[in-house]
Regions:
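Conserved class I S-adenosyl-L-methionine
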Residues: 90-98
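N-terminal auxiliary segments of SAM/dcSAM-dependent transferases
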Residues: 1-51
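Conserved beta-strand signature within the Rossmann-like core of class I S-adenosyl-L-methionine
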Residues: 187-195
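Conserved SAM-binding loop
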Residues: 129-130
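Substrate-binding/catalytic lobe of Class I Rossmann-like enzymes that use SAM or dcSAM, i.e.
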Residues: 196-301, 305-307
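Conserved SAM-binding loop of SAM-dependent methyltransferases across substrates and taxa
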Residues: 101-112
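A short acidic, Gly/Pro-enriched loop at the edge of an enzyme's catalytic core
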Residues: 150-159
């Protein structure tokens, strides 16, 4: 699997490499371009994502603690572990960078009693999450912002960010970690869930443009574990307290998404998506699933603390 994936990737990179790099450079995540990059993927419509995601609408890896868990149970196990790593209490004010559709913000407020401020660049997700908190009766405890993470203000007790760092871009990773430090009080904890590239592949990957960056997530970039650790050491006072790898869980999550997408295709097609879109998304699911199975990419939960 890994050898085949590598050949596919090398072939793709050689095809139009200079043009692809130029296009990727123009999509770098400035404040203005970041909003466009997010909209290109996440504003395809909330109804579209509801067809293949779990009941809570989480678009990130689940954590399966046994073979019998379904997708929704795995997603809730993921949220529980993140909140437990942060040791959330009712007195905490939690900052979430990357709202998604509001599942984690709702979960933390409901089950741990904390206040939550969460931010997104997607207008579709902002509208959905705001309405979600109102339906849940949590509008007084959860604030949903339409705001770039670099423009956040204030100080928080805990910080969480789930698979948002991949949308930051390599150039802006130092600013991302500095922002996380600036928004956390001294002694505060941060929990990140991040898709990572193998350390050994990081240098070559950072000089190329892959299928995901070109067609699925414009402006996207996967960090490596070593790169994140070095950036935190160089630019912040964060100390890593826990690192938990769950790569095989992402392969299983993607298999669920692929199956649900295929099963719901007739309904998805009615939303205005064509056969090319169907093939591209099935390739995207399969491409990523193969990467996680081959362990060329993985996903980790990283917990760090300001000292």
């Amino acid at each position: 699997n890994g050898e085949v994936l590598g050949r596919l990737e090398r072939g793709f990179r050689l095809l139009g490499k200079p043009v692809a790099r130029l296009r990727h450079w123009t999509r770098r995540n400035t404040r203005a371009q970041a909003r466009e990059n997010i909209a290109a993927h996440y504003d395809l419509g909330n109804e579209f994502y509801a067809y293949f995601l779990d009941d809570d609408l989480l678009y990130s890896s689940a954590l399966f603690t046994d073979d019998q868990q379904d997708l929704t149970q795995g997603q809730r196990a993921k949220m529980a572990r993140l909140c437990d790593q942060l040791a959330l209490t009712p007195g905490d004010h939690l900052l979430e960078i990357g709202t998604g559709w509001g599942a984690l913000a709702e979960y933390a407020a409901r089950h741990y009693g904390c206040r939550v401020t969460t931010t997104t660049l997607s207008r579709e997700q902002h509208r959905w999450a705001t309405e979600r908190m109102a339906r849940a009766g949590l509008q007084d405890r959860v604030e949903v912002l339409l705001c770039d993470y670099r423009d956040l203000r204030g100080e928080y007790d805990k910080l969480v960010s789930v698979e948002m760092i991949e949308a930051v871009g390599q150039r802006y990773l130092p600013a991302f970690f500095r922002t996380c430090q600036a928004r956390l009080r001294p002694g505060g904890k941060m929990a990140l869930q991040a898709i990572t590239i193998q350390d050994q592949r990081y240098r070559d990957y950072s000089k190329s443009v892959d299928f995901i960056q070109r067609y699925i997530f414009p402006g996207g970039f996967l960090p490596s574990i070593t790169a994140m650790s070095e950036l935190m050491t160089r630019h912040t006072d964060f100390v890593v307290r826990n690192l938990f790898d769950m790569g095989p869980d992402y392969a299983r999550t993607l298999a669920h998404w692929r199956q649900r997408f295929t099963h719901a295709w007739q309904d998805i097609e009615k939303l205005g998506f064509d056969e090319r879109f169907r093939r591209m998304w099935l390739y995207y699911f399969g491409y990523c699933e193969a990467g996680f199975n081959a362990r060329t990419i993985s996903v980790v939960q990283l917990t760090a603390e300001r000292v």
